[in-house]
Amino acid sequence: MTKGSVGKTLAWSGAVALSLGLAMAQAPAASAQMTAQAMMDRAEIEDLLARYYWNFGGGGAAFGSFYAPDAEMVLGKNSYKGAAAIEGAYKAVPADAPQRKSFSLNILPTNILIVVHGATATAQLVFTETVVDKQGDPPRLLTQGREFDHLVKLKGRWLISKRQILGPNAKPDDWPK
């Protein structure tokens, strides 16, 4: 073997070993077996969350329609139980709040982690709210936080059963480790 071919062989061996190591490594949240059904459920949940956040920009659906009938939304120290109470919480946001009086509001969900457990699931994400105050203005950051959701599949449809909205560096005490 030449010096160059030994180097190439070592490089390929290292790449294969690294690839195998990465393939065999297990992320903590990915420990649940990923079946075809779980992948479809995960896609449905991701779509539910995307539609939920799209709704803030005038998507039209009632916020309560994303929740199970007996759902709970925890926002800071306030808790709203039932789809009607959750809908009411959104309607109660004052007209002079930046989210309401701005030209546009966009909420960007990122770092979405969804784990499906049959007919239940959990989802956690980071949300970033941006507003454009007047047409032509640059967007500005309004707030950022974390969301932790418990979901349930009812009559073939994924719905939020509990939604906890927290600050940018918080985690609920009852959240799975």
Describe each region flagged by the PLM:
Residues 60-127:
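A solvent-exposed, acidic/Ser-Thr-rich amphipathic alpha-helical stretch
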Residues 28-61, 65:
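Short, low-complexity N-terminal intrinsically disordered segments enriched in polar/charged residues
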Residues 43, 102-105, 140-142:
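Transmembrane beta-barrel outer-membrane domains
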Residues 129-133, 151:
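Beta-strand elements of well-folded, non-transmembrane domains
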Residues 107-109, 142-147:
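Short, surface-exposed coil-to-beta transition loops
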Residues 122-124, 144-174:
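Short beta-strand edge/turn micro-motifs at domain boundaries
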Residues 12-23:
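Bacterial N-terminal signal peptides
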Residues 1-7:
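N-terminal secretory signal peptides that target proteins for export/translocation
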